[in-house]
Amino acid sequence: MKSQQEQHFDYVKIGIASPERVRQWGERTLPNGQTVGEVTKPETINYRTLKPEMDGLFCERIFGPAKDWECHCGKYKRVRHRGIVCERCGVEVTESRVRRHRMGYIKLAAAVTHVWYLKGIPSYLSILLDMALRDVEQIVYFNAYVVLDPGNATNLSYKQLLTEDQWLEIEEQLYSEDSQLEDVEVGIGAEAIERLLQELELEAVAEELREGIANSKGQKRAKLIKRLRVIDNFIATGARPEWMVLNSIPVIPPDLRPMVQLDGGRFATSDLNDLYRRVINRNNRLARLQEILAPEIIVRNEKRMLQEAVDALIDNGRRGRTVVGANNRPLKSLSDIIEGKQGRFRQNLLGKRVDYSGRSVIVVGPKLKIYQCGLPREMAIELFQPFVIQRLIKSTIVSNIKAAKKLIQRGDESVWDVLAEVITGHPVLLNRAPTLHRLGIQAFEPILVEGRAIQLHPLVCPAFNADFDGDQMAVHVPLSLEAQAEARLLMLACHNILSPATGKPIVAPSQDMVLGCYYLTAENPGAQRGAGRYFSSMDDALRAYEQGDVDLHAYVWLRYLGDVETNEADDRVLESETLEDGSILKIYRERKVRETAEGEMISQFIRTTPGRIIYNKTIQDALDLTERTLPEGLPV
C-alpha cells in the first residue's frame, strides 16, 4: 500500500522566488541521470501525429506522458513499466496526471525586469533604487543609459541618466589615446537594473534611512519611511532585491494551459501558449544574434522586444500596447488568470464548492424567532440525507442504504417525519457573501418550509447586510458534535446582538418593523367604530377588534391595574364624583380611577386603542418569556 505523506502547515506565504528556486521548480533529474526541464522550442504539437513536440511547450520528456503509462515513441505501454525511462524518447513511464503539476522553465538570453515590481503601485524598483519611475522605465526599455560607476570622471555621478548622444561623447573620450578617464561603467536595460540592485547593501541603507528619518520631517520623512518599510520587508523575508529581475521564467504545467481539438479538426488553445511562444521565439532569436555577434543596436532592440514579451506574459496591458489574438481580443496573461472575482484565488481556492452545503434566494420570515430560519424541504432532505438514512435504518423502516435512497427519491411520508426529527436541535450555518466580519456567518435552528427559498428573520439582516431584493445565501451543515456545539453556543443569532466592531446593537428594528410599530400606536380621530367602549381585559378588547366591532385606532377604555407612563404627567383630576357605595371616581385626561374613601385604588380604566394593546401585549409576552428562561438571580 502506497504511504501518503501528511504535511501540516499554518499558512501559505507568497514571496519573490530566487532564480535558483525557479530552476528547481522546472528542473528534474530522470532515473537515467538525464536533466530535463528547459523549454527551448516554441512548438506545441505536431500537426500530423498530434503528439507533443520534444523540448516544446507540451514536451512529454519535461512534463510527463500525455497518455497513462505510455512513452512518446510507444515502446513502453502498460502500468508494469512504471518508472522506466524510455531509451529512445527519454519519457518517464508514469501517469498522465503529472502534467497537472510538473513545471518547466525558459532560460532567458538576457535579464528582464518583473513588470509587477516595475509598474505596480507603488513601484518597488523605483522605491528601492531611490529613482523616479520614469527614469527606471527609460533604463529598462533601452531609452537611456545609467552610470554604474563614475570612475574618475568629475562630470558623472552614480545612477546618473545619459542619453545616447551623451554616452557616445563619453565613449569617444574613454577610448581616445590621451584619455584620462578610468573605470567608467555605464549600463542599459534590465542588466543595469540588476547590477544596481546587487550593489544595494540593505542593512547599511536601512541604518542610513533610520538616521535620515530622525533628522527630517514632512514629505521627505514620509518618502524615507516608505523606502525603509520596503527594505525592512526584504530583510525580514530574506529576499534579495535583484530577484525582481528575471533570468529564468517558469513554464506552468501543460494541463493548466490546455490545447484541445475541436470537431472541425481545428484546435482551441489557452492564451498562455501564445504568450509563451512569443517569449521563446524572441529569446531564441536573441541568443542567435548574440552568437553571431550582431551589431549592438540590433541586439538591444531584440532585448527590448524580449522584455515586452515577458511583460505581456506576466501582465498583458500593464505597460505599452496590449497583445491581442484573433478578433482583436486581448490575450489573458498570468495576472488575468489569478486576479479578480473569477480568478484562481477567489473562484477556485477561496470559493471552493463544499459538501453538505446549499444555496438559495432569501425571503422574509416574519413568524420566525430570531434564532430560526426557514429551510426548504427539498434542500433539507438533500443536506441531511446521511442523517435521515441512518435514522431510517436504525428505526427498521428500511434495511439498507439503497432502499433508504429509493424511499427518499419517492418522497415517502415517513421520510418527512424522520427529517423533522433529524433537524430538531441540529443548527445550520447561514453565510452571505461577502463575509466582511464575523457576523456574516451565523447559526440558526432550521424550520422546514414549503417552496424553494430560505426564510430569514428580518432583524438579522443588518448583520449580514442582506435585503430581500434577490439576495442569495449559502447553508452549511455542521457535522461533528463539536461543530454543532460551537454553532449553538457561539454562533446562534440570538447570541450576536452586539456588533463586534463598535459594541453597539446590530440587531435593531428598521423599515417594515418601524412602520408597523408606528401604525399600531398611531392616532386616527376618524376611527369611530366601537369608540368609547369599556373592556375588562386585553383579551376582550382584542377579541372585539378581531370580530370587527372596534377599529384598530378607535379610543376605548381598558381595565388595567398597572402603572401607565404618558408623555406629560397625568396627575391633574379633571372631574371627581362620589358614587352610591361611597367610593370616589376620579377622571383624569387619560384614565378613570375608582378609589375607596381612604384613597385605595379599586379599579382603573385607561384610554387606549386596540393597536396599542397589541403592541404592549407583544412586548410584555416577550419580556415574560425572557424572565422565565433566565437563570435565577440574573437581571432581566
From Swiss-Prot:
Q: Which UniProt keywords apply?
A: DNA-directed RNA polymerase, Magnesium, Metal-binding, Nucleotidyltransferase, Transcription, Transferase, Zinc
Similarity comment text for this entry: Belongs to the RNA polymerase beta' chain family. RpoC1 subfamily.
State its cofactor.
Mg(2+); Zn(2+)
GO function term, MF aspect, one = magnesium ion binding
Q: What is this protein called?
A: DNA-directed RNA polymerase subunit gamma
Concerning Pfam families, the annotation shows:
RNA_pol_Rpb1_1 (PF04997), RNA_pol_Rpb1_2 (PF00623), RNA_pol_Rpb1_3 (PF04983)
This chain's function reads: DNA-dependent RNA polymerase catalyzes the transcription of DNA into RNA using the four ribonucleoside triphosphates as substrates.
Question: What SUPFAM superfamilies does the entry give?
Answer: beta and beta-prime subunits of DNA dependent RNA-polymerase
Cite the cofactor comment: Binds 1 Mg(2+) ion per subunit.
Name the catalysed reactions.
RNA(n) + a ribonucleoside 5'-triphosphate = RNA(n+1) + diphosphate
Instruction: List the GO terms this entry assigns under cellular component, sorted alphabetically.
Output: DNA-directed RNA polymerase complex
Residues annotated as binding Zn(2+): 71, 73, 86, 89
Tell me the first and last residues of the signal peptide: none
User: Does the record's keyword annotation contain Membrane?
Assistant: no
HAMAP family named among the record's database cross-references: RNApol_bact_RpoC1 (MF_01323)
E.C. designation(s)? 2.7.7.6
What InterPro entries does the database record attribute to this sequence? Answer: DNA-dir_RpoC1_gamma, DNA-dir_RpoC_beta_prime, RNA_pol_asu, RNA_pol_N, RNA_pol_Rpb1_1, RNA_pol_Rpb1_3, RNA_pol_Rpb1_3_sf, RNA_pol_Rpb1_clamp_domain
Q: Which GO terms describe its biological process?
A: DNA-templated transcription
Q: Where does Mg(2+) bind?
A: 467, 469, 471
Cystine residue pairs = none
Subunit organization: In cyanobacteria the RNAP catalytic core is composed of 2 alpha, 1 beta, 1 beta', 1 gamma and 1 omega subunit. When a sigma factor is associated with the core the holoenzyme is formed, which can initiate transcription.
